[in-house]
Amino acid sequence: MNSVSTQLILVLASLLLILPVVEAVEAGDAIALLLGVVLSITGICACLGIYARKRNGQM
C-alpha cells in the first residue's frame, strides 16, 4: 500500500507542476485554435465535395 500512496503523491506533484503551463493559454491561443478548427472543417468539406463531383462524373 505504501507504493500506491507514493505513486499518487508523484502524480499529484507532476500535475501541480504542469498546471501553471496550462493556465498560460491566452485569448490569442484560443482564437488561433478556433480558426484552425474552422479551416480544417472547411477543407474537409471541400475535399468531400470534390470527391462527390468526381464520383458523379460532373468533373
Curated annotation (Swiss-Prot):
The keyword Mitochondrion applies. Residues 51-59 are cytoplasmic. Disruption phenotype: Following challenge with vesicular stomatitis virus (VSV), there is increased production of cytokines including Ifnb1 and Il6, reduced viral burden and higher survival rates than in wild-type mice. It holds the Pfam family DUF4730. It is a single-pass type I membrane protein. Interacts (via transmembrane domain) with antiviral protein MAVS (via transmembrane domain); the interaction disrupts MAVS interaction with RIGI and inhibits MAVS aggregation, resulting in the repression of type I interferon signaling and innate immune responses. Negatively regulates antiviral innate immune responses. Disrupts the interaction of antiviral protein MAVS with innate immune receptor RIGI and inhibits MAVS aggregation, resulting in the repression of type I interferon signaling and innate immune responses. This is Small integral membrane protein 30. It comes from Mus musculus.
